[in-house]
């Protein structure tokens, strides 16, 4: 797929990309595991690097990355569960974009002051006027607006509907149970609102690089991810400056910090990366350097 070389932040540009009629999400393209690698980088190869980061940051770290050109993988605790926090917004937005026509995406969604939840920097400015469904999706992805995320959940039939839709695209791992902001409370041992790095990377791959979405909504989603405003210190900070990064971040209780991304090296095929982390202590804070450090290990392995 070819993507625009310049970043465009206006919703007018996003709307223009949406002119291709949207189709309901299909189950024909599963985000399943990457194709078998010819020269797989095993967990053992890099376990020392990732364990060093876990020790340095007193955290449990999960990583899965795949070079989509070679099938080469990097992984560490890739099948362990972590709270996904706000990274789900990439998927809820993708599903809403895929299930609505361009005309439906321009319909205004209304809400009240009572609907606002913590961290809603965009929706709190538009209570009186409402926002189009496209603007709601943009607020959720690019600004991680929590009220916008709940409006997307509502469009999908709540967490249950979201999970059902994810099953349709082939993700049989994600567990969706609560809305914002309760879904961010994921203590050790909790399985609600969790997934694994491998599954998160697979679903992002399916939405952005696969054929789960028609070209129009897929391009809109990709532009939103490329213009994300919350990820400068995470995966973006761990890759070379000339790489293009489309990502969605997340943070929650117990020092949880996540980032999922598709990254485009200048001369190579995209790499899909999911980094998830958490700590044992209830009041622990996250450290973005853990995510960027894990990304640096991935980059060194896949693009030395």
Residue ranges and their predicted role:
Residues 68, 106-123, 156-157, 183:
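Acidic helix-start/capping segments at beta-turn-to-alpha-helix junctions
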Residues 20-24:
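C-terminal motif of bacterial Sec signal peptides marking the signal peptidase cleavage site
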Residues 116-152, 159:
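Conserved catalytic neighborhood of penicillin-recognizing serine enzymes
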Residues 199-251:
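Conserved active-site loop region of the serine DD-peptidase/beta-lactamase
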Residues 153-204, 208-209:
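Mid-domain, small-residue-enriched loop/turn segments at the edges of structured enzyme/sensor domains
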Residues 3, 7-8, 26-50, 155, ...:
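Structured C-terminal helix/loop/strand segments within mature extracytoplasmic catalytic/sensor domains
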Residues 71, 82-114, 140, 273:
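Active-site SXXK
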Residues 42-78, 263, 273:
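A short, well-structured edge-of-sheet supersecondary motif
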């Amino acid at each position: 797929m070819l993507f625009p070389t310049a970043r465009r932040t206006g919703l007018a540009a996003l709307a223009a990309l949406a002119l291709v009629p949207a189709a309901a999400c299909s189950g024909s393209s599963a985000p399943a595991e990457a194709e078998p690698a010819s020269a797989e980088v095993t967990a053992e190869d890099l376990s020392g690097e990732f364990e060093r980061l876990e020790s340095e940051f007193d955290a449990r770290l999960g990583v899965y990355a795949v070079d989509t050109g070679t099938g080469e993988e990097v992984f560490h605790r890739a099948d362990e569960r972590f709270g996904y926090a706000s990274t789900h917004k990439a998927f809820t937005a993708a599903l809403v974009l895929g299930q609505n026509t361009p005309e439906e995406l321009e319909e205004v969604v209304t809400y009240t002051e009572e609907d606002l939840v913590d961290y809603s920097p965009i929706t709190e400015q538009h209570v009186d006027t409402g926002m189009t469904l496209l603007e709601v999706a943009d607020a959720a992805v690019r600004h991680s607006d929590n009220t916008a995320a709940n409006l997307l959940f509502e469009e999908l039939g709540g967490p249950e509907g979201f999970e059902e839709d994810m099953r349709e695209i082939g993700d049989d791992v994600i567990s969706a149970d609560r809305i914002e902001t309760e879904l961010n409370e994921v203590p050790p041992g909790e399985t609600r609102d969790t997934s694994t790095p491998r599954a998160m990377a697979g679903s992002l791959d399916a939405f952005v690089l696969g054929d789960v979405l028609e070209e129009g909504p897929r391009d809109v989603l990709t532009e939103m991810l490329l213009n994300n405003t919350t990820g400068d210190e995470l995966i973006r900070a761990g890759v070379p400056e000339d790489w293009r990064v489309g990502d969605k971040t997340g943070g929650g209780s117990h020092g949880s910090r996540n980032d999922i991304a598709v990254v485009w090296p200048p001369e190579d095929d995209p790499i899909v990366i999911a980094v998830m982390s958490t700590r044992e202590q209830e009041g622990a804070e996250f450290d973005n350097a853990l995510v960027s450090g894990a990304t640096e290990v991935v980059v060194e392995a896949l693009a030395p």
